[in-house]
Amino acid sequence: MYSTGLVRWLVLAVVAVLPLVSALGLVPYPDQDPFYYPPSGWQNKKPGDILRSRKIQAASVGALKFNLNAWQLLYRSNSNTAHTPSYTITTVLVPHNANKKRLVTVSSPENSNWIRCAPSYAFRYSGVLELTNFEPRWEQMLYMLYLEEGWVVNAPDHEGPNSANAAGISGGHMVLDSMRATLNSKEIGMDKDAKLIGHGYSGGSIPNGWAAGLQSSYAPELNIVGWSLGGTASDPMMTLDFLDGSATAALSLIGAVGLVDGYHDELYDLFNNQIWTDEGKRAVWTAHHACVYEMVFLFMNQVIQSPKYIKGGKNFSDYPQVAKITNKLTMGTNPKYVPRKPVFMFHAAYDEEIVWYQANNTAVAWCEQGANIRFLTETNKALNHVVTYLLNLPYIMEYMRDRFAGKSYYNGGCQFDSMSEYPLFDTSVLGDRFKEILQITLDLLGKEIGPNDSIYRAKLANHQNPNKVGIIHPSGMKSTTITPGEGGNDSPASKIVRKTGKASSGNSSTESTSKNQTQSGGDTTNIDQYSADGKGAGQGNN
């Protein structure tokens, strides 16, 4: 019996490899578009400085025009250190009647090693239905929720010019510098004191999580009011191991290739001369010439860490140079990089792609280092990786509205909850906001995008502030705030699960199990359902 997650990958992978339609040359690919290449002297600019700017017709799946204003900015940034010049592009969507004091930056789960899979290219209108490179395209449809609020949306190509997937620190720099660039754009005209929120799910959680940790030292001037992270892939080695041999084994290969692309000087010779077999090198070439769904189709259930692809069938963690970098890129291990603004994290206990342990470990580590976090575990067994994202959209929206409104977030402490409900269809949570979700359909069919719609007018007629929550009620979500350092079953330390073996990548030495308690009702749910050890664990929910 296939899980809905696997069906999603199967269907979209088949669609991706069918030559149904193409852009017919109407929009040049990024590697053939001069806009993607910086002018001479760009290295001397400051991070966030705009190098090129253009107005575009934004669209979904190539053919469904967005009825709003959109710009693309080529801007100066940095790669994996704060002093290593790089550059990338961001796409900025400005709805009608926009509130220029609100900016939501979304890190798309690109999950690819090819520049032609970049979100910026997926935003372009070609006039032809395009079903390839669907990974960033499907999430773009969700941006309507933010745009209907009147918020400006900023979507950077966080993998940069080398398409360095999962490179962590590099992506964090590019996310923060995309905010700077958006604020610097005179054409867009953002308020210089605009409130900023960063959001990222799955592959997008990596650059977004690193942006959260880097912000206080790298971009302290930005008026960040919150970060939203879901399905957080916070431990690179655990992710590589967990996915290997599963239906989405391609993501393990893509992640390894991304590490090499992001840390070329440190890892390229090692991988090219000592790690990859000839078949492995062919797989790397394929990764550099395909988007994620094609890759999933081609490498389904393949064991990457095997003699077929790696000399001697070794594991990535067997190489100290690799383990050193993945340890460095594990969120929560360095006290220098801790979020200093409120963070909302949510994760499915039965996530078949990104194991729950790593996200929980990071939340606990950050909490113990003074972060302000709410970590929500979804315990319903029907909630897989993608469904968890979709069904938590009301909570994401509620969180963002509250942050923009300046509300306190658990008194600056930490909160660890679990729940089993389907939040999207819980009327006590969603209420009339279901009507607003229906607006997405109209938006994609060409309706003028922005808060000047029937719901907006109805709120005004009822003397409601359309920019306040007022409708969503977080029933079943309230529980006692947990402060780092408290003892007993309610302390963050009791919630952590550290696994030994290959998947731990040497980041943890203590093996334990944990029960995540729903504090509002007192019930307990055993989260220790997956073993993070061994290859092929990602198939556990299929």
Curated annotation (Swiss-Prot):
Record-annotated disulphide pairs: 117-291
Keyword Disulfide bond assigned: yes
Pfam families named among the record's database cross-references: LIP
Gene3D superfamilies the UniProt entry points to: 1.10.260.130, alpha/beta hydrolase
EC code(s) of this entry: 3.1.1.-, 3.1.1.3
Transmembrane segments: none
Biased composition (Low complexity): 502-516
Signal peptide feature range: 1-25
Residue ranges with Polar residues bias: 517-529
Keywords: Disulfide bond, Glycoprotein, Hydrolase, Lipid degradation, Lipid metabolism, Secreted, Signal, Virulence
UniProt-listed GO biological process terms: lipid catabolic process
Active site (UniProt): 202, 351, 385
Presence of keyword DNA-binding: no
InterPro entries registered for this protein in UniProt: AB_hydrolase_fold (IPR029058), Lipase_secreted (IPR005152)
Reactions accelerated catalytically: a triacylglycerol + H2O = a diacylglycerol + a fatty acid + H(+); a monoacylglycerol + H2O = glycerol + a fatty acid + H(+); a diacylglycerol + H2O = a monoacylglycerol + a fatty acid + H(+)
Region (Disordered): 466-542
Major enzyme class: hydrolase
Induction (record text): Constitutively expressed regardless of pH conditions or exposure time.
UniProt-annotated glycosylation sites, renumbered to this chain: 315, 360, 452, 507, 516
Subcellular location per the Swiss-Prot or TrEMBL entry: Secreted
One GO cellular component, as annotated: extracellular region
Annotated GO MF terms: triacylglycerol lipase activity
Family of the protein in this entry: Belongs to the AB hydrolase superfamily. Lipase family. Class Lip subfamily.
Physiological role: Secreted lipase that hydrolyzes acylglycerol lipids such as triacylglycerols and consequently releases free fatty acid. Can hydrolyze 4-nitrophenyl palmitate tro release 4-nitrophenol and palmitoic acid. Due to an absence of fatty acid synthase genes in Malassezia species, secretory lipases are essential for the yeast to generate free fatty acids from degradation of sebum and assimilate them as lipid sources for growth. Plays important roles not only in lipid metabolism but also in the immune response of host cells and pathogenesis.
Protein name per UniProt: Secreted triacylglycerol lipase LIP3
Organism encoding this protein: Malassezia furfur (Pityriasis versicolor infection agent)
